[in-house]
């Protein structure tokens, strides 16, 4: 119990060294993982629905962008991204992290797109004959039909964001998470926290 009460991370806030304890670390972690996982699940689902439902010429371009970003490493983007978030005023905020994670690029887009293509269009057509809007068709018919894919993608995103300590360190330096605290634990000299089974 002493080890848990001493579990903390020291960060600089307003030029002062501040200790962030387990309660705040857990709160930051849950806000980070839940919001980011939700954003990273909803964005590809919406874009995948639009590209699978409507045949635009631009769909091929979107698919190409997704594939290219999966194949080519984007090295050196952090400096530009930090500058952009500072310019927009969303650096070091949770809402800024949510905006950053609200993107459709990646494997989840392809997974959602193939799932939406597997849904029979007769359901949407019959709903539209009854007067349902396109938004209603998307939210009430197509999304519930692939709930299992939503749950799988959301769970994978949760696990990924739970273990991610570098992104909060870079983009939210004043809101450390438990993952970052566990990373910092290997460098501590506190005798209550250097007990080997704890590490």
Name the predicted role of every residue range:
Residues 1-199:
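A structural signal for multi-pass alpha-helical bundles of membrane permease subunits
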């Amino acid at each position: 119990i002493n080890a848990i009460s001493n579990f903390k991370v020291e960060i600089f806030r307003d030029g002062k060294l501040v200790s962030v304890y387990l309660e705040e670390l857990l709160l930051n972690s849950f806000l980070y993982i839940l919001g980011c996982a939700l954003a990273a699940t909803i964005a590809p689902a919406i874009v995948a629905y639009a590209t699978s439902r409507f045949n635009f010429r631009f769909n091929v371009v979107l698919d190409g962008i997704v594939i290219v970003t999966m194949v080519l490493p984007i090295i050196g983007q952090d400096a530009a991204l930090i500058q952009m978030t500072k310019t927009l005023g969303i650096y070091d905020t949770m809402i800024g992290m949510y905006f950053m994670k609200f993107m459709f690029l990646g494997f989840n887009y392809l997974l959602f797109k193939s799932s939406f293509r597997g849904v029979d269009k007769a359901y949407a057509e019959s709903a539209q004959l009854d007067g349902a809007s396109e938004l209603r068709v998307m939210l009430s018919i197509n999304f519930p039909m692939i709930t299992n894919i939503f749950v799988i993608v959301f769970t994978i995103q949760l696990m990924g964001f739970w273990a991610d300590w570098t992104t909060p360190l870079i983009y939210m330096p004043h809101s450390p998470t438990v993952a970052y605290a566990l990373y910092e634990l290997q460098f501590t000299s506190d005798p209550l926290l250097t007990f080997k089974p704890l590490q």
